[in-house]
From Swiss-Prot:
Protein known as: Rusticyanin
Induction: Expressed during growth on Fe(2+), sulfur and thiosulfate.
GO molecular function per UniProt: copper ion binding; electron transfer activity
Native source organism of the sequence: Acidithiobacillus ferridurans
Residues in Plastocyanin-like domain copies: 85-187
Gene (name only): rus
Length: 187
């Protein structure tokens, strides 16, 4: 008989097998983008300072940005948050509201010591398959390095969105399917 715990365990084994298969055939990093020299390292105090540079204002589960240039700072699985998730302004997978025509500077930080992640922007909304095929509009970060030696990986990119609804998604197999995504409304 399956209990909720055994079903969850079996599901994660399936996701893990899918990720291993994807990596074996070269899909894991190809789906998330390439690991490149744009990734830098930061210590925990540096990460905390970066998180403070987000220019949004929180209201409920929404972070609203204003102005011609906005700075979104997103982290993967900050301490105290469930795996897998993104955090912006201490909110799990919040909706981001951004003015149309703004220049959006994104800093993405991976603080999850067990996994790499990606932060990609797409028009395709949920639900997402274990092996998501989302055709990113912005293949934002590529595949992040796994943090080690007390240092975390981060990278920056710039986006110039037009009005519409978008989603930020982690393309690592199984992550978006288990909730590692959020909505972006540009208006």
């Amino acid at each position: 008989m399956y209990t909720q715990n055994t079903m969850k365990k079996n599901w994660y084994v399936t996701v893990g097998a899918a990720a291993a298969l994807a990596a074996t055939v070269g899909m894991g990093t190809a789906m998330a983008g390439t690991l490149d020299s744009t990734w830098k390292e930061a210590t925990l105090p540096q990460v905390k300072a970066m998180l403070e540079k987000d220019t949004g204002k929180v209201s409920g589960d929404t972070v609203t940005y204003s102005g011609k240039t906005v700075h979104v700072v997103a982290a993967a699985v900050l301490p105290g948050f469930p795996f897998p998730s993104f955090e912006v302004h201490d909110k799990k997978n919040p909706t981001l509201e951004i003015p149309a025509g703004a220049t959006v500077d994104v800093t993405f930080i991976n603080t999850n010591k067990g996994f790499g992640h990606s932060f990609d922007i797409t028009k395709k909304g949920p639900p997402y398959a274990v092996m998501p095929v989302i055709d990113p509009i912005v293949a934002g970060t590529g595949f992040s390095p796994v943090p080690k030696d007390g240092k975390f990986g981060y990278t920056d990119f710039t986006w110039h969105p037009t009005a519409g609804t978008y989603y930020y998604v982690c393309q690592i197999p199984g992550h978006a399917a288990t909730g590692m995504f959020g909505k972006i409304i540009v208006k």
